[in-house]
Amino acid sequence: MNRREFMIMGAAGAAMAGRNSLYAAANAGVQPRSDRGIVKRAAPPRNPRPYTGLDWSKVVKVKTTSHGHCMSQWWLEQYLKRGFGLITMSNYYPSAPWCPAAKMTENYYRLHHEHAVMVNGIRKDGPFDWNKIIEPWKHTLDPAAAAKKPAWAAKYPFVEGKKIFKPLPPGVLEAPNAEHHSFRLENGKWAGNLHICSPGSTFASGTFDAHNLSKTFSHGYHYGSGEFWGTAIDRMIEGMLYEDGGGVTINHPSWTKLDRELMLRMLDHDPRVLGIEVIEDSGYNSENYWDWALSTGRQCFGFFVPDWHVENKVFGVNVLCVQEKTVHACLKAYRDGNFYGALNGLDELAFTRIAFDGKTVVAATDKPARFEIITARGVVKEVKGNEVSWTVEKEAYWQGPGYHIFARVKAYAVDGSKEVLFSQPFMLKS
């Protein structure tokens, strides 16, 4: 399954909505925004100074990603080969956690669908017995259409199959996550290019039938969220395992050409919307989105992901910096911004220190590197070696307040490995 196919087949929402009158009729009269049933919990702002209080001499580095699909044992092995210590599979159809991995079987969510779904524009709680639901229209199912998409098809009636994964190796942690899609905008229109992950949340949305092979979409069962994006985010937050850990990520803004104002509205919606993907689908680089958001004065953490492309060297890895290796500590590292990004994540280069004391940004690596300090003004310092420091300049009168706004560190390997590291940003005026 590739993303181009995903968009063409209508799983992004807007395209299918435009050419499917039945779908439009099923959703007529839906209120654009509805926060009913959501209990909002207060949360502090996103941390303006990540890594504060970390004892780098005792830091345990846990490799993971916030957005990586994992559909079989082969996929899982790609993460394990790269040394992942935390698995947070972000699968969809439905957008539901594959956690614990030990429970997952072939056809699992066709037989064990417990979460709510939007049905004819109304949110209905589970469980859903799909064999029983589909039975009245089973004679309309098209085997030829299913044969064209074997990865997403299953013979009706559905039967639970074998386990998908072998047991995780000792010491490898796992936490819930999923990739959610098909949201409404504030005006009720579809945000076809908006995808969201929520590492640490048990929230689930949508159905197994994104390609309508079982005709559930034709009968009013929405394959994705189907709700206003803000309501869906609130549900993700409501499902967090820990109040102080995990969060929401805005996926592949460059690949989907995400509207920048929508990105800002999402960051403003709740501080647990942690940030955006920087290294994303197929190795796309979204540093332009990242620096633009940061230049508005908003803290915005950067995430580094393989998405579907686990066979590439350019992978996208989040390196969590924790004092103890537990699920809670790992998810709290996400919330606090105590992690950095790696382009490859093959241990070819690592940060050994990143800090900001309010005046000076410092960073160090385990091997020589080429460092860049990046602010709202661009690259303000470049140096080679094992460490870098940059003291915030006293602003000249012609520059005005908040001239630099933020600072982040980027480190390039100089040994030919092509590894690149990305610190989280420091907001210079918290």
Question: Which residues does each PLM region occupy?
Answer:
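N-terminal export signals
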Residues: 5-27
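Aromatic-residue hotspot detector
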Residues: 6, 172, 366-368
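Short Asp/Glu-rich motifs
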Residues: 15, 98-99, 260
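Surface-exposed flexible segments
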Residues: 21-23, 214, 293
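Charged catalytic cores and adjacent phosphate/nucleic-acid-binding surfaces used
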Residues: 29-67, 73, 77, 189-201, ...
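A metal-dependent hydrolase metal-coordination microenvironment
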Residues: 43-245, 251, 279-290, 305-308, ...
